[in-house]
């Protein structure tokens, strides 16, 4: 473990909470101190759930550590059953309680409760949230699901969606409609929306559709081996992937690969004349491996973007992530340190970032357009409207979401033509995002510079130049602390002629070049010398 300001994943017990919260008739008894109850807010505040998660905490305190914490846990289990009357109970420890080493599974079994008890042993100091969700769902399936006779009509299970998942609610609806249009029934959706009774009848389906490998692949592999159910490998995000998914499902179900794409508009929108400004946009992707790999395909093959960087935070999927990146001629960035991600983005200077909530913060700091494609996300990415990522409607949503942060084609030309205009200057941002308020009393930078009291500058002969004859840039250079690099006015003006999406990189390279050469003032000549140096 490490101390950090921000993390992509919580501890494993948060993943277990996502599974329990998504289900009905399930209750999770968590051996944890009072401080770990913060996790409730993830669901009530961020996901806007109307009720708190079905989780009971032992909430032990420091004074309890010298007494019997095992009895405290058993009391919590007994009270949870009597109060909530669940169909099944999950038991486990938080990262803090793991240090006490109480056997939560054995303690719960000793109570002989009249419902199944699912034991969770989640290594809090080696694994994280997605593993916790994946492992919890696997243990639930092992405890409750059994082989059984198949349904008369061809059917499947949808595996992987959980509470707090990125657009899982809407993806379930979209994929269900897609399958029903092919004549395939959905036997159960799990864990989200499923009860323990639904888990028990998973074996009735003919095959499984794995929507989210991060949280459902272990259960899908177990079902393939134990229940003799094959599962899909294609995640239907994007037009191409959805068509591949339809073909894969049709082969498993023995039906015709036909799907209703009458609502699909993304291909024409991407190819139409008012969308050509998308072509060649440089994009950086980061998030969970499943969404990043799928989004990279959409970005390159369906939007016409150039993928310049991609990576994921979940190390369990490092191998497929690296294999996918090779297909784009890239080396995948696999890290859970947001500072490394920010460093990579600064070095690549993309025109668009597709990432998580953290990349949205990074993009805001760097002034780069951004769209969210993956958990973890904040409250605004749990919309009231129908907004799937999967299927044909999901492809439409991807197009709208990704192009919205970008500057429109005609407006980009206006920015090039009227760089100094009060309305169309680079810092104003795309007009459809709303203007940036500037206080009426705040003077422009050049006016402020001219308003400063002028100071004299020494000549080479030891005399002085009258203050009014000193150019503002020279005055700034004279007043700058020793060793600080100053841009002259003509160089700043020339820098603004460089497209805004690579201007930051050009500025950094020029300042680095000047520092290496021992220069403290950057002129137009320095700017072009630096350009020639880095172009070699």
From Swiss-Prot:
The active site is at 274 (proton donor). Pathway: Porphyrin-containing compound metabolism; bacteriochlorophyll biosynthesis (light-independent). It catalyses: chlorophyllide a + oxidized 2[4Fe-4S]-[ferredoxin] + 2 ADP + 2 phosphate = protochlorophyllide a + reduced 2[4Fe-4S]-[ferredoxin] + 2 ATP + 2 H2O. Its EC number is 1.3.7.7. It holds the Pfam family Oxidored_nitro. Substrate binds at residues 409-410. Residues 426-448 are annotated as: Disordered. InterPro entries: ChlB/BchB/BchZ (IPR050152), LI-POR_suB-like_C (IPR013580), Nase/OxRdtase_comp1 (IPR000510), P-CP_red_C (IPR042298), Protochl_reductB (IPR005969), Protochlorophyllide_Rdtase (IPR016209). Keywords: 4Fe-4S, ATP-binding, Bacteriochlorophyll biosynthesis, Chlorophyll biosynthesis, Iron, Iron-sulfur, Metal-binding, Nucleotide-binding, Oxidoreductase, Photosynthesis. [4Fe-4S] cluster binds at residue 36. GO terms for biological process: light-independent bacteriochlorophyll biosynthetic process; photosynthesis, dark reaction. Its cofactor is [4Fe-4S] cluster. GO terms for molecular function: 4 iron, 4 sulfur cluster binding; ATP binding; metal ion binding; oxidoreductase activity, acting on iron-sulfur proteins as donors; oxidoreductase activity, acting on the CH-CH group of donors, iron-sulfur protein as acceptor. Binds 1 [4Fe-4S] cluster per heterodimer. The cluster is bound at the heterodimer interface by residues from both subunits. PANTHER family: LIGHT-INDEPENDENT PROTOCHLOROPHYLLIDE REDUCTASE SUBUNIT B. HAMAP family: ChlB_BchB (MF_00353). Protochlorophyllide reductase is composed of three subunits; BchL, BchN and BchB. Forms a heterotetramer of two BchB and two BchN subunits. Component of the dark-operative protochlorophyllide reductase (DPOR) that uses Mg-ATP and reduced ferredoxin to reduce ring D of protochlorophyllide (Pchlide) to form chlorophyllide a (Chlide). This reaction is light-independent. The NB-protein (BchN-BchB) is the catalytic component of the complex. Belongs to the ChlB/BchB/BchZ family. This is Light-independent protochlorophyllide reductase subunit B. The lineage of its organism: Bacteria, Pseudomonadati, Pseudomonadota, Alphaproteobacteria, Rhodobacterales. The gene is bchB.
